[in-house]
Regions:
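N-terminal "assembly arms/tails" that initiate or stabilize quaternary assembly
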Residues: 2-100
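Sequence/fold signature of self-assembling virion shell proteins
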Residues: 16-49, 164-177, 208-326
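A generic local secondary-structure boundary/capping motif
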Residues: 56, 183-187, 225-227, 283
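Alpha-helical scaffold segments that mediate packing/assembly in large oligomeric complexes
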Residues: 113-185, 312-314, 318-325
Length: 326
């Protein structure tokens, strides 16, 4: 007689310590030298994308929340004192501004076949692209806070964004008005100038104006900021494709941000800055070591500190019919 044996189906994944590419473990499978190499590649690419963030006042923090305090200003004492009479004096106070951080991150999985058979260094390539995306993400989060500021001016004295057309371009006169607005609000300058963060489509119109051309024909302005393209009326222009584009109907409109010093703050949480995370196939690739992962993670927080030091100027451009919202 033959003995009948029952065959059991085993799920080998039950014996795997980690079967998904999402869980975070240590970096034990990678040498310190390689980890430093990839960390540097990602962070360098991330920093190249940070146009808005470079102008923020960095605030170190140890938790999830920070509080800025700014003292109220005093009125001028223009009335002469009366002999023997004590003046009423002024009240001293301060304004409190609070902000918290949010955590963001993403990753990509690279298969063992692609990693082993590709001609290029796939891990390094993915790290570079992840770094660029990390920087763009961080800077866009900062931009979204800044474009929500209270102070706005529309080109050609239009009443609202919806009234703007492609003909309502950013002009040298409008630049001068924005600079005057900052001066009247006593906004301090950034390294001797105000700064405007401008979209390439808007910069195209401004740089084609006769006043811009004449100024730069006789003035050799050395750039001091990342992305800087020139200066006009005491304003240094910094170009960014991340500058906000709105699209209502068929016309794209653009937000150019004019800034004074310390107009906004950037939170710098201790131990929660930009982090590059690489997991080898041995660490994360399941029972058959089928993939590795490359990702990033960071905490972000930003807050407008002085509404009177930031002006959003909304205009159209020669590309209003072509550009999409971002």
């Amino acid at each position: 007689m033959f003995k009948t044996e029952e065959m059991l189906a085993l799920n080998l994944q039950l014996f795997s310590a980690d079967v998904t590419p999402i869980n975070v473990t240590t970096q034990d499978g990678m040498s310190p030298t390689m980890k430093t190499f990839y960390d540097t590649a990602l962070l360098e690419n991330a920093r190249e994308q940070m146009i808005f963030t470079q102008f923020g006042k960095k605030q170190p923090m140890h938790g999830n929340k920070v509080e800025w305090r700014k003292f109220n200003t005093f009125a001028k004492a223009l009335t002469p004192l009366t002999e023997g009479v004590i003046p009423s004096g002024q009240t001293f106070g301060m304004t409190k501004i609070e902000a918290t951080t949010t955590q963001h991150g993403d990753f990509v999985a690279v298969s063992d076949r692609l990693e082993l058979e590709a001609y290029d260094d796939v891990i390094f390539g993915a790290t570079e692209e992840m770094g660029a995306t990390e920087g763009e993400t961080y800077d866009t989060l900062t931009r979204n806070i800044l474009v929500a500021g209270n102070s706005v001016a529309y080109a050609n004295d239009k009443a609202s964004r919806s009234a703007l057309t492609a003909d309502d371009k950013l002009t040298p006169e409008l630049v001068a008005k924005a600079a005057t607005w900052l001066k009247k609000n006593k906004a301090p300058k950034i390294d001797g100038s105000y700064v405007a963060i401008i979209h390439p489509s808007v910069a195209f119109d401004l740089r084609n104006s006769e006043e811009w051309k004449e100024y730069h024909k006789y003035n050799d302005v050395a750039p001091i900021f990342k992305g800087e393209i020139g200066e006009l009326h005491g304003v240094r222009f910094v170009e960014s494709t991340a500058s906000k584009v709105f699209k209502e109907g068929e016309v794209a409109t653009y937000a150019t941000l004019f800034l004074g010093k310390d107009a906004f703050g950037i939170l710098d949480p201790e131990g929660e800055g930009m982090e590059m995370i690489v997991k080898t196939r041995e660490q994360i690739g399941g029972p058959l070591n089928q993939f590795s992962t490359i990702g990033y993670k960071f905490c972000h927080g930003a807050k407008i500190l002085y509404q009177e030091r930031i002006l959003r100027v909304e205009t159209g451009s020669s590309y209003s019919a072509l550009d999409e919202a971002n």
